[in-house]
Swiss-Prot record:
It comes from the Eukaryota. It holds the Pfam family DUF4644. It comes from Mus musculus (Mouse). The lineage of its organism: Eukaryota, Metazoa, Chordata, Craniata, Vertebrata. This is Uncharacterized protein C16orf90 homolog. Residues 116-125 have a biased composition (Polar residues).
Length: 171
């Protein structure tokens, strides 16, 4: 009560808070888009970008490295050209260096399976390979990619994390 009655008593004190609230808000609204808004926007973008770099590696390995890495690898690499399997293996080797040995071995083990499963289930190869096997084991086709996807996720995620951290460290 004392502070409340004392604040309005002073001419400068009640003058300052309204100024802060009204003037501050007004200034933010007016200058927001041009000067003041650009900085927080930049910061937010930066935060989101860094979070986007961080999250996929840790929280959604299937989402980011699955769709981006494996999608490119499978769709562009193994399906279109048969040389696809050595090409993606070369890439991690170049990026990783010493850590590639077990990763590439795992990739070699799972890549042929996955490329086979993908070619069988892909629409382009469906008329050739998929039609005869579709009527037989549809579950087998569904299981194979699932298995190899899981294995590839496990192999790729350390890769993604390592390459990401490497890229972050370089920058």
């Amino acid at each position: 009560m004392d502070a409340v009655s004392w604040a309005p008593g002073r001419p400068s004190h009640p003058d300052t808070p309204p100024n802060i609230y009204e003037g501050g808000l007004g200034a933010q609204q007016q200058q927001g888009p041009s000067a003041q808004g650009s900085k927080p926007k930049n910061f937010r973008l930066r935060h989101l970008r860094s979070l986007a770099l961080y999250l996929p590696g840790h929280m959604q390995p299937a989402g980011q490295c699955g769709s981006h890495w494996l999608g490119r690898l499978m769709a562009g690499g193994s399906l279109t050209r048969p040389e696809g399997s050595p090409w993606p293996l070369d890439l991690p080797q170049g990026t990783l260096g010493p850590g590639n040995s077990h990763c590439s071995a795992l990739l070699e083990a799972h890549l042929p399976r996955d490329s086979l499963g993908n070619t069988a289930s892909s629409s382009s190869m469906d008329p050739a390979k998929g039609v005869p096997s579709q009527s037989g084991p549809p579950e087998g086709l569904g299981l194979r990619p699932k298995r190899s996807w899981r294995a590839l996720e496990e192999t790729m995620c350390p890769l993604c994390k390592r390459t990401r951290s490497g890229a972050l460290e370089r920058t």
